[in-house]
Design a protein with these regions (language model features):
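Sequence context surrounding c-type heme c attachment/ligation sites in exported
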Residues: 25-30, 37, 41-65, 83-172
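Bacterial N-terminal signal peptides that target proteins for export
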Residues: 1-10
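Short, structured beta-strand/loop micro-motifs enriched in basic residues and often containing a Trp
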Residues: 67-77
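Bacterial N-terminal signal peptides
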Residues: 9-19
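Sec/Tat signal peptide C-region and signal peptidase I cleavage site
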Residues: 20-24
Length: 172
């Protein structure tokens, strides 16, 4: 049986989108109120699982992850209109899973164990020193350590300064 590239992509996206149980514990309603990221104070937004799909991503070794990026309505409107910089109130959420081979179809990769929920929040006044963005990286619903958060803005600044510090583009 021949599978088209778009068919494989659709299968991957459906697998990622249906992986809700892996991240159920990461939603704000299940995390303590104090579960805010160091430096930025970002929390996992309530209801993010209902937000629109922005794009998939794949991270090579050493992380070896499958990722999906979701955007709130403010992000989606900006992306659809190619608006830069993103307006205040824009929020991206990236969900990541370990990539594992499919047991049903060898060439395909499917989501394995959930690894992180990563959040970017645009507030140009509050996050003036980081290009207007606050960052949060969460593992099992809890913020990652300070050291991980200290690298967020530097990485975005070095690579995507000309795209309002955002790597993600709207998938066609």
């Amino acid at each position: 049986v021949k599978c088209s590239r778009s068919g494989l992509a659709a299968t991957l996206l459906l697998s990622l989108a249906s992986a809700t149980p892996s991240f159920a514990a990461n939603e704000t309603r299940d995390a303590p109120a104090q579960a805010a990221s160091p430096i930025y104070g970002v929390t996992i937004p309530h209801g993010y699982r209902t937000w629109q799909f922005v794009a998939p991503a794949e991270e090579a070794d050493p992380l070896d992850e499958l990722r999906i990026v979701l955007g709130n309505p403010t992000v989606m409107k900006a992306l659809e209109k190619n608006t830069l910089p993103f307006p205040d109130g824009s929020i991206f959420v990236k969900l990541a899973w370990k990539r594992v081979p499919s047991t049903e179809f060898g060439p395909a990769s499917v989501p394995g164990a959930a690894t992180t929920v990563q959040v970017m929040v645009k507030d140009s006044k509050r996050y003036r020193d980081s290009g207007g963005w606050g960052f949060g990286r969460f593992i099992n619903g809890q913020p990652a350590d300070l050291a991980q958060h200290q690298t967020c803005f530097a990485c975005h600044q070095a690579r995507v300064r000309n795209h309002d510090f955002v790597f993600t583009r709207l998938a066609p």
